[in-house]
Regions:
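Active-site anion-handling motifs in enzyme catalytic cores
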Residues: 1-389
Length: 389
């Protein structure tokens, strides 16, 4: 047996907890890498890649893509890992620890580094690491999951950004309900009673939080309040029937650390990829829903907001959308109002289930290049020198 082939996974960092909230988008990126790994000889845990010391002393090829990384103290990976550094995002929250002398030496030795975003590219180049913008490996998901347009069905709304003003304010060290917002909530609830009641039944409106992670507030009114905030905004650009017929999904999942396995999380991620690949339309603020949709040529409306794209935003880590946002057709949301600089979207007054549009084509050149690089890397019959040509 020659060199082994591994699949990098990012199991939740539990630190003693029984349940951990996990962004399944990390596993969507693993699904993209898995297309090029046949067979998968073993999983390699990203957060513990420095501890990879196989008993057989054989190296393992590993496509290293994704978000790096929670446990920065475990960087860089073991010498037994032969890495392809591609579609990497280095979090500004971890950059100082990852880019120490040892970390920079690893990146230089195994570069050039394909960067998921332009922020990471600029960051690495400032540290003397050869880097280029590769975009995200999930753009290649059409390689396996693309279906004929005639077989498309269903609509998916996945973690769309919308504002949820706090109904509780703190005054004099005590918590009080905000009177004007409560009145507005009651007014809008009565105004949009039927669609709001229908939407509030969906698990999404219990679980969703625009700030990330899952909403742990289980107050009875919360799903109705979130449904009101969503519907009164999105009805302005999306037809009522589309909003009510769509399936709502959040990428945040609760993981039971005592029973969960990598196979289960990969299966969940793959089931989402298949949904997006088969949809008539996807509406999202999640890049690991939007980019797979581009890759499988599913029409996608990307909802952007200052909170989503800002270098200082709390929707995720700063810098993660540099170079990616331009691949989408975008609706910008500010407060409760939509705007767009996209000429095609500007011509659509309201999206319905019959609205037809095509995505931009800019993503395709990145998908083609990623496919070639990953296929070449995983080829057994090429020397290391040939693979780096």
């Amino acid at each position: 047996m020659g060199i082994k082939r591994g699949l990098m996974v990012q199991f939740p960092c539990a630190r003693g907890r029984t349940f951990v909230c996990k962004n399944i988008g990390d596993y969507v990126q693993s699904i993209a890498a898995r297309q090029f790994v046949d067979p998968v000889d073993e999983y390699v845990e990203q957060e513990e890649a420095d501890q990879y010391y196989p008993e057989d002393k054989k190296k393992i090829k590993l496509i290293m893509n994704g978000w790096f990384q929670w446990r920065a103290e475990n960087w860089p990976p073991s010498d037994y890992i032969e890495p392809l550094l591609i579609s990497m995002h280095i979090s500004p929250l971890r950059a100082d620890k990852l880019l120490n002398e040892k970390g920079i030496r690893f990146l230089r030795t195994n570069g050039p580094v394909g960067c998921r975003d332009t922020y990471t590219k600029d960051l690495l180049e400032k540290h003397g690491v050869p880097a280029y913008f590769s975009s995200c490996l999930t753009l290649t998901l059409g390689k396996k999951y693309r279906i004929p347009d005639s077989e498309r069905k269903g609509f998916y709304i996945v973690d769309p950004y919308f504002e949820i003003p706090d109904l509780i304010e703190e005054r004099d060290g005590r918590k009080h309900r905000h009177p004007l917002r409560m009145l507005r909530f009651l007014f809008d609830y009565l105004r949009y009673y039927r669609p709001v009641r229908e939407l509030a039944k969906r698990d999404f409106f219990t679980l969703y939080s625009p700030k990330g992670f899952l909403d742990r507030d289980r107050s009875h009114y919360r799903p109705y309040y979130k449904a009101v905030c969503f519907y009164k905004t999105y009805r302005k650009r999306f037809d009522k029937k589309l909003l009510l017929d769509a399936e709502y999904i959040t990428h945040w999942v609760d993981v039971n650390m005592s029973t969960a396995t990598n196979d289960q999380l990969l299966n969940l991620a793959e089931s989402l990829v298949r949904k997006y690949a088969s949809a008539k339309m996807v509406i999202t603020s999640r890049i690991h829903c939007g980019l797979p949709s581009l890759g499988t040529e599913t029409p996608v409306v990307f909802i952007a907001n200052e909170e989503v794209v800002s270098e200082n935003g709390s929707f995720n880590t700063p810098g993660r959308l540099g170079g990616l946002l331009e691949l989408f057709r975008v609706l910008n949301l500010s407060g409760e109002e939509f705007s767009t600089e996209d000429g095609l979207f500007a011509s659509i007054s309201k999206f319905t289930e019959d609205t037809l549009f095509s995505n931009k084509d800019d993503w395709k050149k990145y998908a083609d290049d990623l496919d070639k690089v990953c296929t070449r890397f995983m080829s057994d019959d090429l020397s290391e020198e040939q693979r780096n040509e």
